[in-house]
A protein has these predicted regions:
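Proteins synthesized as precursors that undergo proteolytic processing into mature forms
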Residues: 1-77
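Terminal-appendage/accessory-domain detector
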Residues: 35-36, 52, 57, 62-117
C-alpha cells in the first residue's frame, strides 16, 4: 500500500485460499482503524473461503449468533499457538512505515517473530 511518501504498508501471509481474507482484514485494521501491525494481526479474524465461516472464538458471541441466524455455517477456531502451523486462518506478517520508522507484526499463533535493526 502506497501513500504520497512511498510505501506505507506491506502485508503478506501463508495459508493458501485463506490468504485473501487474512490480508484484507489486516489492511483494513491498519488503514481504517489505525491499528499497529501487531494489533491488526492479533485482532480476531474470520475466514469465509471454505464451506464454513471460520471465526476466531474471541469474537463477540452476539456477532457469532447473528451470522448463525443469517444461515451461515460457523466453525469457531480457538486462538492458541499451534506448533504444527495448522489452523483455520492464514498466518500474516505486516510492516508499516512512518517516515524513517518501521513497525512489524507477526502471527503470534504460529512460530514467528519480527526482528530488525
Amino acid at each position: 500500500v502506497m501513500d504520497n511518501e512511498g510505501v506505507k504498508l506491506a502485508v503478506g501471509a501463508s495459508g493458501g485460499r485463506r490468504i485473501t481474507n487474512c490480508v484484507t482484514q489486516v489492511i483494513n485494521n491498519v488503514l481504517d482503524f489505525s491499528m499497529s501491525p501487531q494489533d491488526a494481526i492479533d485482532f480476531p479474524r474470520s475466514d469465509c473461503s471454505g464451506s464454513y465461516v471460520n471465526l476466531d472464538s474471541r469474537l463477540d458471541p452476539i456477532v457469532v449468533q447473528g451470522l448463525k441466524d443469517k444461515g451461515h455455517l460457523i466453525k469457531l477456531i480457538d486462538a492458541v499457538f499451534d506448533p504444527t502451523g495448522m489452523s483455520g486462518f492464514a498466518s500474516p506478517i505486516a510492516i508499516t512505515r512512518n517516515k524513517n520508522r518501521l513497525n512489524a507484526g507477526v502471527d503470534t499463533f504460529h512460530s514467528a517473530y519480527a526482528e530488525g535493526y
